[in-house]
């Protein structure tokens, strides 16, 4: 089955430039400083943020805050049962990318010698897992009230026969499809995370990049609305 | 989450409990509000989410696997269910990396013991044995998303919910070449001219009336309690994980497992008292679950998170 | 061991220089360091040098059972060793985050980009496959570690040849290289990595930064491209804030570099193949080390044309005695030269006379005689020791003093015309000792 049918529809009925429905809920986790549950269609991600708190001696940085990320998937999140929820190479790599991305966004100079923990749990993975984690983390950080340069938004884009497709599902994430996960701040042209899977021809690079950037801007609009609504809902508590 | 309370608070708590009054107004045998929702995940064969008192949050997911085994190599029939409890780092920073592995393994082992006679207890579980050398393997995985005491209780409720939600496909077993068997999904033809793949597969459900339940009974001072909050867990003398199963023949409860969690000393009479309390509480819980499972409407999967 | 951090003044100087477009090794901001690539004498080994960064890669293959998930695909395993030899901050036997990143990148480039045909590595589906192992050892670190490691690994894979196999009904026959020529791996394309450093929020681009420069930069990005103008990997090494245009620019720079380096790799492999097919013994890694070593000298081997001895009696029974020195023969090996017992005294007397006659032509100047006699003593000591070890009689042991410009013409102590009786008897004693 081809990814884009002859009429121009994808397997789940979307158009190539259409993203899935985004559903969010903030403040689920009572123990954490900030938490967010985010859905990109069938991909469900839970993110919890702890901190900033005094860091352990091994991780302490004198001039800025240390960011520790952990990406884990539940054993029942994928199509086949996975034995190890975390600790394998792929999860460590994604954790590292999340750390690097958010080090650029969070104003770490405001909290020297402290640590911020970001934990992402993928409850159900149906493609674009990394992008969903970045979005969930941005909202969780906003919920925790940690100062940032802006809300980061991410999207995964692939290309099929010179046509870009955005927000891939797991059925579309095949071994042959080149895809780029891009994260930007506030939908502007400031890229904080870039990850490429499979080989991409250089002529297609600018096409994919532009599509990804546009999608990030769209996702940012959704996330910004969510953050504003949450703030309005909390305003009575703040005594405003 | 590590809760630190002062000695005066502990004293207040212990003396209150000994008079059957807890800090949040419950009695010693009361549970916190339980929210149970099934069918939460569409990617699993059965799932359930349980919230205890709005803080402890456990998600259970079941995945089926077709397993081939060597009947000669196994002396007794192996249990088709395997349990795995994972503490997500969302629950607490201390569970990051390998922090939650030890506690998770302890609870998984307790469940394995509690369900060890499940082939006798659960009436139609033996249907999972398909043919000589093939059976369904039921992998029950639990993910603890939030932690505020009483994790084993929440886990056992989630397991019962998920098992009742589980749908196992019906299969037809036919002999094949080379001594093997071919296993094909059964699709009952209801007439009409639908293609073979479009006919939905027939499913059967497990009967969970007498499913074992794992309860945590703790001893604070001279009183026995169920469902401790984190503050109460700081004051306990000792804790027992007791597995209770409903006996269908006699209107009574069987104890399938007793495990001590943590340290502490217990007298023989205390253990008897605690098991009695566990049976009584289990009775109440079974009734509540039955009522809930009957009256629950099927909602959109995953809706519970958005509430 | 902790590496002392970069001092603030060093950092400021480097940043200032970079901002004005100058670098400490006189390169331009967009200039690469020279790359040296050498393949070893053993098949499947390569050393890559970029500036001061040195990496060695070795490829080996083994037959193994495939995983049940992929029964007809071969397996490629990558192992990286970051030893304290490269950088003192590395821990021995433990891969820190840098090592994990390197392994991840190598896996991405070699495994995930599918540059090697793993299906051709299958011998028997479900039972036997080739497990190819790439070992990468970092010898020295000075920036662009990922580039160097990838290049070394790719060259080693290109160079490697696995043994040829045939399938028999009940077993697999593996041929050695002498029976059937080994088969090279089926490589579709060669991904080449480039490390691009970023400065000033991505406004400036610094190509191929050294270790010191990398510590001052804002961040870096690694791009892997191949000759077919495909981007194989876009790896974010550190945190960065870039625009998409800048990313595209970096990719273009990496692309041109990849094309140049692919040509270099192919050249090196072709040259090595030419040498091997001409049956020339490959130089291997010896050409990487400069041959200027002051602490050892070479001495030319000299062959002594020893005279033949006439036998007086019983010629049929005795072997032809040839007290020749066999050059390159290990005099310490037991039983290398077997000789029979001959009448010693007459033999010795004859030999003496002959040697005296031939030695007469050599002029031994007086000032050297003292030195010569010292050496003579040393030689005697050495001869004593060697004789003691030697089993066979009449074997002459060649001892040369290294460093001497004029090796002694004869092994035996220099015999002057007026030979002492002592000397002869002592010499005889030596012989008798055996």
Curated annotation (Swiss-Prot), chain A:
Q: Can you cite a GO biological process for this protein? A: nuclear mRNA surveillance
Instruction: Using the record for this protein, list the coiled-coil segments as residue ranges, or answer none.
Output: none
GO CC terms for this protein? cytoplasmic exosome (RNase complex); nuclear exosome (RNase complex); nucleolus; nucleoplasm
Chief subcellular location equals: cytoplasm
Question: Does the record's keyword annotation contain Metal-binding?
Answer: no
- Keywords for this entry? Cytoplasm, Exosome, Nucleus, RNA-binding, rRNA processing
Where does this one sit in the cell? Cytoplasm; Nucleus, Nucleolus; Nucleus; Nucleus, Nucleoplasm
Q: What Gene Ontology molecular function terms does this protein carry?
A: RNA binding
Q: Name one Pfam family in it.
A: RNase_PH_C
Q: How does it assemble?
A: Component of the RNA exosome complex.
What family does the database annotate? Belongs to the RNase PH family.
Known role: Non-catalytic component of the RNA exosome complex which has 3'->5' exoribonuclease activity and participates in a multitude of cellular RNA processing and degradation events.
Q: What is this protein called?
A: Putative exosome complex component RRP41
């Amino acid at each position: 089955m081809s990814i884009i049918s002859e009429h121009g529809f994808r397997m789940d009925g979307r158009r190539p430039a259409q993203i899935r429905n985004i559903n969010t809920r903030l403040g689920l986790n009572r123990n954490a400083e900030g938490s967010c549950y985010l859905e990109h269609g069938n991909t469900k991600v839970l993110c919890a943020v702890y901190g900033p708190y005094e860091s352990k001696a091994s991780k302490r940085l004198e001039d800025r805050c240390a960011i520790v990320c952990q990406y884990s998937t539940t054993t029942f999140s994928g199509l086949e049962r996975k034995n190890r929820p975390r600790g394998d190479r792929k999860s460590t790599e994604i954790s590292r990318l999340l750390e690097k991305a958010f080090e650029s966004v969070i104003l770490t100079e405001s909290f020297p010698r402290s640590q911020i923990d970001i934990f992402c749990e993928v409850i159900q993975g149906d493609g674009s897992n990394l992008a969903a984690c970045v979005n969930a983390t941005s909202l969780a950080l906003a919920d925790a009230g940690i100062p940032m340069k802006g809300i980061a938004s991410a999207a995964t884009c692939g290309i099929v026969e010179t046509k870009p497709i955005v927000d891939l599902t797991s059925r579309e994430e095949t071994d042959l499809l080149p895809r780029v996960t891009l994260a930007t701040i506030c939908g502007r042209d400031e890229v904080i995370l870039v990850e490429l899977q499979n080989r991409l021809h250089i002529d297609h690079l600018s096409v994919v990049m532009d599509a990804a950037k546009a999608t990030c801007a769209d996702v940012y609009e959704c996330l910004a609305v969510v953050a504003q609504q949450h703030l309005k809902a909390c305003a009575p508590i703040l005594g405003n | 989450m590590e809760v630190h309370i002062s000695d005066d608070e502990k004293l207040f708590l212990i003396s209150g409990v000994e008079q059957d009054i807890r800090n949040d107004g419950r009695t010693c045998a009361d549970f916190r509000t339980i929210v149970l929702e099934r069918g939460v995940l569409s990617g699993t064969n059965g799932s359930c989410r349980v919230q205890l008192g709005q803080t402890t949050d456990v998600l259970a997911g079941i995945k089926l696997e077709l397993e081939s085994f060597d009947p000669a190599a196994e002396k007794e029939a192996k249990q088709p269910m395997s349990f795995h409890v994972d503490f997500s780092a969302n629950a607490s920073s201390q569970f990051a990396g390998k922090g939650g592995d030890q506690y998770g393994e302890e609870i998984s082992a307790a469940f394995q013991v509690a369900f060890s006679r499940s082939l006798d207890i659960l009436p139609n579980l033996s249907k999972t044995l398909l043919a000589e050398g093939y059976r369904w393997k039921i992998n029950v995985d639990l993910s603890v998303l939030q932690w505020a005491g009483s994790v084993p209780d929440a886990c056992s409720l989630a397991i019962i919910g998920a098992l009742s939600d589980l749908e196992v496909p019906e299969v037809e077993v036919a002999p094949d070449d080379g001594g093997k068997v071919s296993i094909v999904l059964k699709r009952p033809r209801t007439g009409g001219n639908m293609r073979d793949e479009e006919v939905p597969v027939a499913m059967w459900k497990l009967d969970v009336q007498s499913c074992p339940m794992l309860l945590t009974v703790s001893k604070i001072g001279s009183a026995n309690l169920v469902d401790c909050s984190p503050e109460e867990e700081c004051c306990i003398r000792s804790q027992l994980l007791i597995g209770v199963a409903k006996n269908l023949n006699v209107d009574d409860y069987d104890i399938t497992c007793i495990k001590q969690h943590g340290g502490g000393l217990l007298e023989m009479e205390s253990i008897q008292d605690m098991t009695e309390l566990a049976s009584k509480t289990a009775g109440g819980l079974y009734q509540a679950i039955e009522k809930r499972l009957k009256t629950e409407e099927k909602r959109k999967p995953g809706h519970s998170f958005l509430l | 061991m902790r590496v002392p951090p970069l001092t603030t003044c060093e950092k400021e100087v480097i940043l200032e220089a970079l901002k004005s477009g100058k670098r400490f090794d006189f390169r331009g901001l967009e200039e690469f360091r020279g790359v040296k690539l050498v393949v070893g004498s053993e098949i499947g080994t390569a050393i890559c040098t970029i500036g001061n960064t040195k990496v060695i890669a070795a490829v080996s293959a083994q037959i193994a059972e495939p995983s049940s998930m992929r029964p007809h695909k071969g397996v490629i395993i990558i192992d990286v060793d970051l030893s304290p030899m490269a950088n003192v901050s590395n821990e021995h036997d433990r891969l820190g985050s840098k090592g994990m990143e390197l392994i991840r990148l190598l896996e991405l480039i070699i495994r995930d980009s599918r540059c090697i045909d793993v299906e051709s590595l299958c011998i028997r589906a479900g039972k036997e496959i080739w497990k190819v192992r790439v070992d990468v050892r970092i010898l020295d670190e000075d920036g662009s570690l990922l580039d160097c490691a990838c290049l070394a690994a790719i060259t080693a894979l290109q160079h490697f040849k696995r043994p040829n196999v045939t399938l028999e009904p009940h077993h697999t026959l593996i041929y050695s290289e002498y029976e059937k020529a080994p088969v090279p791996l089926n490589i579709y394309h060669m991904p080449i990595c480039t490390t691009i450093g970023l400065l000033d929020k991505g406004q400036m681009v610094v190509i191929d930064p050294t270790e010191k420069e990398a510590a001052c930069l804002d961040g870096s990005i690694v791009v892997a491209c191949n000759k077919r103008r495909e981007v194989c990997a876009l790896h974010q090494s550190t945190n960065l804030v870039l625009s998409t245009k800048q990313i595209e620019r970096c990719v273009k720079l990496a692309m041109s570099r990849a094309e140049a380096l692919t040509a270099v790799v192919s050249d090196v492999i072709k040259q090595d193949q030419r040498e091997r097919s001409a049956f020339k013994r490959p130089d291997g890694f010896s050409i990487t080390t400069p041959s200027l070593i002051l602490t050892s000298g070479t001495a030319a081997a000299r062959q002594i044309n020893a005279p033949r001895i006439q036998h007086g009696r019983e010629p049929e029974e005795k072997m032809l005695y040839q007290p020749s020195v066999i050059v390159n023969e290990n005099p310490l090996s037991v039983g290398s030269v077997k000789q029979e017992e001959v009448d010693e005294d007459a033999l010795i007397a004859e030999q003496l006379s002959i040697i005296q006659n031939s030695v007469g032509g050599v002029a031994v100047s007086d000032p050297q005689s003292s030195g010569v006699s010292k050496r003579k003593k040393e030689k005697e000591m050495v001869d004593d020791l060697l004789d003691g070890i030697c089993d066979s009689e009449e074997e002459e042991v060649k001892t040369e003093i290294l460093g001497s410009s004029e090796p002694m013409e004869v092994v035996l102590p220099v015999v002057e015309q007026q030979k002492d009786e002592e000397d002869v008897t002592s010499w005889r004693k030596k012989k008798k000792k055996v």
